[in-house]
From Swiss-Prot:
Any single biological process term in GO: isopentenyl diphosphate biosynthetic process, methylerythritol 4-phosphate pathway involved in terpenoid biosynthetic process
Keyword annotations: Isoprene biosynthesis, Manganese, Metal-binding, NADP, Oxidoreductase
Function: Catalyzes the NADPH-dependent rearrangement and reduction of 1-deoxy-D-xylulose-5-phosphate (DXP) to 2-C-methyl-D-erythritol 4-phosphate (MEP).
Annotated protein name in UniProt: 1-deoxy-D-xylulose 5-phosphate reductoisomerase
Binding site for 1-deoxy-D-xylulose 5-phosphate: 125, 151-152, 179, 202, 215, 220-221, 224
EC class (word): oxidoreductase
InterPro entries: DXP_reductoisomerase, DXP_reductoisomerase_C, DXP_reductoisomerase_N, DXPR_C, DXPR_C_sf, NAD(P)-bd_dom_sf
Amino acids binding NADPH: 10-13, 37-38, 124, 126, 208
Family: Belongs to the DXR family.
Co-factor(s): Mg(2+); Mn(2+)
List of residues binding Mn(2+): 150, 152, 224
MF (Gene Ontology): 1-deoxy-D-xylulose-5-phosphate reductoisomerase activity; manganese ion binding; NADPH binding
Pfam families reported for this sequence: DXP_redisom_C (PF08436), DXP_reductoisom (PF02670), DXPR_C (PF13288)
Length: 392
């Protein structure tokens, strides 16, 4: 019986993970769950799965959750805050940690799981974008097992040699696929007027609002490029992005002999989640098997960087190295939140990120404190840009 902790249990990844657990009660039990503010969803999960511990973001949310669980007769221990979140990530009572908190907020707890030598199922790409060197060092030094859950990186992991899932061993290129989001064919001159609801209407995947906007700008793919660099040791020039509107081929690996290995499947995050949970075995994920006779043609195209400037900015940050990826991520988080709140235009997201990247960066990528200093400085810089863009 594998005991699992889910960080970000009420998000789309967390709920999909619980669905896989639900299908295999003989293999998995839930040790701990966390959510930031969705108390009702977390309470329902605690009633069903009876975790030993649950963590929320605030004292008020903790009181509300405790009351609900007490009324339901559920003895789950409730706590709140960043320290409590790190505590459940490194808890001796858990074997595997699903790191599914979105954004920089998930960095410390994901890193805590790695430093505790856990089996880390990494859906929080920002952990590697912000502090890739620190994170990978922690995995090696503490004997953690790192399994990528993003569908693209999970696909690459499956296509690389199992004896050494890193760049090398005859690998010539890593090919990340992208759906292109909802604006793949839209005239770039009209993107100025995109609304948050339009940006969040992804044609293939069901995701939260922040990652949906990142998909629409292709910043999500840019962050995944940086993540792939750290996960697989591939240099920027050996990572290629291809738009694949059908979202059937989740990524590919090209080899020196001319072979290209691809992982295919219906677009459902339960597939990579189940793969990570059961690795090296495979289990039923609940996903409908792919029928290639129904899927039809598979099409690929090169991204248009005029339409998707955020993708180019991510490659720039990767090549710059140091804290540039952390700066990129922080500025993007601020800009996307502002867009979702109606404070700036869709096209302003890339403008904010580009402007902040051009500024001298504070902090060092050698320590977590340095990375967090760069993150804070970049957020201040991005906030400073918002005023000049508001109302445009």
């Amino acid at each position: 019986m594998q005991r699992i902790t889910i960080l970000g249990a009420t998000g789309s990844i967390g709920e999909s993970t619980l669905d896989v657990v639900r299908r295999h009660p003989d293999r998995y039990s839930v040790h701990a769950l966390s959510a930031h503010r969705q108390v009702d969803k977390l309470a329902a999960a605690c009633v069903e799965f009876r975790p030993a511990r649950a963590v929320v973001g605030s004292a008020e949310a903790a009181r509300e959750l405790e009351a609900k669980l007490r009324a339901a007769g559920v003895p789950t221990e409730v706590s709140y805050g960043e320290t409590a979140l790190e505590s459940i990530a490194e808890d001796a009572g858990t074997d595997a940690v699903m790191a599914a908190i979105v954004g920089a907020a998930g960095l410390r707890s994901s890193l805590a799981a790695a430093r505790a030598g856990k089996r880390v199922l990494l859906a929080n790409k920002e952990s590697l974008v912000m502090s890739g060197g620190i994170f990978m060092d922690a995995v090696r030094e503490h004997g953690a097992t790192l399994l990528p859950i993003d569908s693209e990186h999970n696909a690459i992991f499956q296509c690389l040699p199992t004896s050494d899932p890193r760049y090398g061993a005859g690998v010539s290129k890593v090919l990340l696929t992208a759906s292109g989001g909802p604006f793949r064919t839209r005239d770039p001159s009209t993107l100025h007027d995109i609304t948050p609801d339009q940006a969040c209407a992804h044609p293939k995947w069901v995701m939260g609002r922040k990652i949906s906007v990142d998909s629409a700008t292709m910043m999500n793919k840019g962050l995944e490029v940086i993540e792939a660099h750290w996960l697989f040791g591939a240099p920027a020039e050996k990572i290629e992005v291809l738009i694949h509107p059908q979202s059937i081929v989740h990524s590919m690996v090209a080899y020196a002999d001319g072979s290209v290995l691809a992982q295919l499947g219906n677009p459902d995050m339960r597939t990579p989640i189940a793969y990570g949970m059961a690795y090296p075995e495979r289990i039923d994920s609940g996903v409908t098997p792919l029928d290639l006779t129904v899927a039809g043609g598979l099409h690929f195209e090169t991204p248009d960087l005029e339409r998707f400037p955020c993708l180019g900015l991510a490659f720039d940050a990767l090549r710059a190295g140091g804290v540039a990826p952390a700066v990129l991520n922080a500025a993007n988080e601020v800009a996307v939140e502002a867009f979702l709140n109606g404070k700036i235009r869709f096209t302003d997201i890339a403008r904010v990120v580009a402007t902040v990247l051009e500024q001298p960066a504070d902090g060092s990528a050698d320590t977590l404190e340095g990375v967090l200093a760069a993150d804070s400085a970049a957020r201040r810089g991005a906030q400073a840009q918002l005023g000049s863009l508001a109302g445009r």
